[in-house]
Curated annotation (Swiss-Prot):
GO terms for molecular function: DNA binding. The lineage of its organism: Bacteria, Bacillati, Bacillota, Bacilli, Bacillales. It comes from the Bacteria. This is Nucleoid-associated protein MCCL_1934. Homodimer. Belongs to the YbaB/EbfC family. Its main location: cytoplasm. Gene3D superfamilies: Nucleoid-associated protein YbaB-like domain (3.30.1310.10). Residues 7-16 have a biased composition (Low complexity). It is found in: Cytoplasm, Nucleoid.
Length: 106
């Protein structure tokens, strides 16, 4: 069979890549990524799996007369953390798919 060895080598390479990616996914679960808003008045911490782990609000930003501002800050900090989590994930997993031209892969 022509090219059979090449296909077998490619399959081994894919299996190796899958194993490394699974290991990176596990590491990402333990990663803590912070997003902030309002000059650090609100901080949201997420895992690499995009699970919100903590929300920290400094006392001086709490104004009962302006709840909307606090809501906006929490939303902005959350979105910042999630964007950073996406960046970390793309960087970590992308290093294992570099050079491969497989549709649907990073």
């Amino acid at each position: 069979m022509r090219g059979g060895g090449n296909m077998q080598q490619m399959m081994k390479q894919m299996q190796k890549m899958q194993k490394k990616m699974a290991e990176e996914q596990e590491k990402l679960k333990e990663e803590r990524i912070e997003g902030t808003a309002g000059g650090g008045m609100v901080t949201v911490v997420v895992s690499g799996h995009k699970e919100v782990l903590d929300v920290i609000i400094k006392e001086e930003v709490v104004d009962p007369e302006d709840i909307e501002m606090l809501q906006d800050l929490v939303l902005a900090a959350t979105n910042d953390a999630l964007t950073k989590a996406d960046d970390v994930t793309a960087q970590r997993l992308g290093q294992h798919t570099k050079g491969l031209n497989i549709p649907g892969m990073m």
